[in-house]
């Protein structure tokens, strides 16, 4: 009888573990599906998000270039190439790092398609060696309207960087995105992979040769942290993609640029570069010791109980860096924590020292897992912050296409001001934007499900992109 009870308990435990694995797999699936709702341009025949339709089919015509496609960045209808490139880099990082886990739930093909939708657009935007289009659409006029992308009639103004008007941040991030993606496609489409890598090299040369901050060339998504982080980030990815020592030597020569930081974002990539480069340190590149020190500083700043903790969690345990769209920082931090714990394990390093406190790899992973679980529902609100995941989730994300009737259900045009009756309606959005992760709760773990609360209710591509790696990391440890 005792033996039978043990077997029953083991069976129940395994069943729970399998269910948990299925839940992470479902979250991964929905995280990727979200991007189909953000697509701009001519939609493919295998489009799964049916409430969307073709949009912005003349983008680029003002300059006689083809800038059709890519992603709408958030809940608006503008295409911002700098954060779109960061999104693409993060997606590719997940595909590289967790290929087996993503394949195990049959999502690798969808993820590659998601990446390619971004890289195809970046390639189009890179019209000559020293020219990159960085924005399509006028942010001010777009943000004053509440329209479906399919009805959009605001100006599709074009912005670009060049040798005479540089933006090293945007060019550097585009280089990183294409270099990372070249690794994703290397084994399945070598010709496309080579094209990506060639453009990545050229973009890096452009970013480095014509150094200038994107602050001077942008109306939205301007740089605050400078361009040195993007140059290090791009060089790290190019080294990973090519093995060419010119890139690792570039990093070593400019290691003094590296800073200990407390965030990883579309603007600040220092810790992303550090996390990539610390792998090379453990492979014997002692000249990269500063990057090891800086990434450890980031980890120590995040870990609860660390004597050098700088980011305090909410009462419910969520990392809280900024009130506006805080989950973007949570998902990127979690990306770094999982990657770094994996790097330590591979190097045979069991722990790190944070001042007077030591943290094991398991403790770092468990904390990272707690952040994923918080987003998926283990939080004081008892709700998922991913639309369509679980039984309770945001129903009014700040998102034009989701909040307005689909063009299939209401073919009549909804103009700039006509959409505000839907915006002001306190009812669930008619189109469930499955997989969208909103900006998240406030510092007290509270969330007001209102379209007007864009700081907390708006999804963005880079929140979702940074979530895919962490949730994939948990698939293998749960099943």
Swiss-Prot record:
Gene Ontology cellular component annotations, sorted alphabetically: extracellular region
Where are the bilayer-spanning segments?
Answer: none
Q: Which organism is it from?
A: Arabidopsis thaliana (Mouse-ear cress)
Residues at the active site? 76 (nucleophile), 398, 449, 458
Secretion signal, residue range per the UniProt entry: 1-21
- Write one Gene Ontology MF term: cellulase activity
Instruction: For this entry, list what GO says about its biological process.
Output: cell wall organization; cellulose catabolic process
Annotated localization: Secreted
- Coiled-coil region list: none
The entry annotates sugar attachment on: 29, 442
| Family matches, as SUPFAM superfamilies | Six-hairpin glycosidases
Q: Reaction catalysed?
A: Endohydrolysis of (1->4)-beta-D-glucosidic linkages in cellulose, lichenin and cereal beta-D-glucans
What's the EC number here?
Answer: 3.2.1.4
Hey, which family's this protein in?
Belongs to the glycosyl hydrolase 9 (cellulase E) family.
Q: What class of enzyme is it?
A: hydrolase
Q: What is this protein called?
A: Endoglucanase 20
- Matching PANTHER family, A to Z? ENDO-1,4-BETA-GLUCANASE
What top-level branch of life does the organism fall under? Answer: Eukaryota
Name the UniProt key words of this record, in alphabetical order.
Carbohydrate metabolism, Cell wall biogenesis/degradation, Cellulose degradation, Glycoprotein, Glycosidase, Hydrolase, Polysaccharide degradation, Secreted, Signal
